């Protein structure tokens, strides 16, 4: 109620510093002051049909990793009457899970998948502020401009990729009576987990691209080339090496070298001692045939 009366005084003029809410929330109040009336509720704009499907496809990696993380969190929050949400960087709600009665109450306000948490439509809200401020935000009760949200508490934290770019946000919503002290920190933990997973996927994809480029170059050389991992499993063999050693280029991938070939003693010793070999003559045995090669 104190914030409600503060809002009314703000409409009439200005608020003394002692009566202002947190700076980010107060700045939002100032932006909303000339845009809306607190008592009038305006349902959020909602992306539907092909538009919403296109947004979800564009955010497929965020959704895939986010859904797994949020579902795991919900599994251990069965007694909590709250919702966990995934939003894109524009504030469009892509997916949510959690308490069904709470979800139905939120749907009555127009918050369904595709709804935009835009400050210009619904007033001060945590997801919009989290994206704008770039850090976790919580907006509770009468800190919301719209009176329809005064019974609600929302927390949100942006999700960042390894380049520091916002990829979306994670939000938690519940009735004001059901909020808990750890709600904001929970969204922070989930957002960081999802961000780390996005970064790992990105690094893996980049490594695979570089590896494919390397393999493409090796495919074109005249010499036979093989590569294996620390366990002795074949990771790569080009067409020239497969032909020389009488191996199937595709079927040999991922198999132990010892299953494919009888390695020369000199090569086995060099592998065991981690010693390089340069232009040495060795003989492989493959399919009961001896194959003389010059090895580096």
Predicted region positions:
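PAS-family sensory domains
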Residues: 93-126, 188, 222-276
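Sensory modules in modular signal-transduction proteins
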Residues: 66-85, 200-242
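Non-catalytic regulatory/interaction regions at protein termini and inter-domain linkers
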Residues: 1-54, 61, 100
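Regulatory sensory and allosteric helical modules in signal-transduction proteins
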Residues: 50-79, 84, 88-142
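Short loop/turn motifs at secondary-structure junctions and domain boundaries
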Residues: 75-79, 146-152, 217-219, 272-273
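PAS-family sensory/regulatory modules and their coupling/dimerization elements
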Residues: 142-143, 151-156, 256-296
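Amphipathic alpha-helical "output/dimerization" segments
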Residues: 179-193
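Extended hydrophobic
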Residues: 142-176
């Amino acid at each position: 109620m104190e914030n409600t009366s503060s809002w009314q005084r703000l409409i009439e003029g200005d608020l003394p510093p002692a009566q202002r809410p947190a700076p980010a929330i107060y700045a939002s109040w100032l932006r909303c002051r000339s845009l809306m009336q607190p008592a009038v509720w305006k349902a959020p704009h909602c992306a539907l049909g092909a538009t919403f499907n296109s947004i979800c496809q564009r955010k497929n990696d965020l959704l895939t990793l986010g859904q797994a993380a949020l579902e795991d969190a919900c599994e251990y929050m069965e007694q909590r009457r709250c919702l966990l949400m995934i939003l894109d960087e524009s504030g469009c709600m892509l997916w949510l899970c959690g308490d069904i009665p709470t979800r139905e109450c939120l749907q009555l306000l127009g918050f369904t998948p595709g709804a935009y948490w835009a400050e210009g439509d619904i007033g001060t809200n945590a997801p919009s502020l989290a994206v704008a401020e770039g850090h976790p935000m919580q907006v509770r009760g009468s800190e919301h401009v719209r009176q329809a949200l005064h019974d609600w508490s929302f927390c949100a934290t942006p999700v960042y990729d390894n380049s520091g770019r916002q990829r979306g946000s994670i939000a938690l919503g519940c009735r004001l009576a059901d909020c808990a002290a750890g709600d904001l920190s929970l969204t922070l933990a989930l957002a960081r987990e999802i961000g780390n997973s996005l970064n790992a996927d990105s690094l893996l994809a980049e490594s695979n691209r570089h590896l494919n480029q390397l393999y493409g170059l090796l495919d074109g050389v005249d010499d036979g080339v093989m590569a294996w991992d620390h366990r002795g499993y074949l990771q790569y063999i080009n067409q020239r090496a497969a032909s020389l050693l009488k191996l199937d280029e595709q079927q040999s991938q991922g198999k132990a070298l010892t299953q494919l070939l009888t390695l020369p003693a000199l090569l086995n010793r060099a592998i065991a001692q981690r010693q390089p070999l340069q232009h040495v003559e060795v003989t492989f045995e493959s399919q009961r045939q001896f194959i003389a090669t010059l090895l580096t």
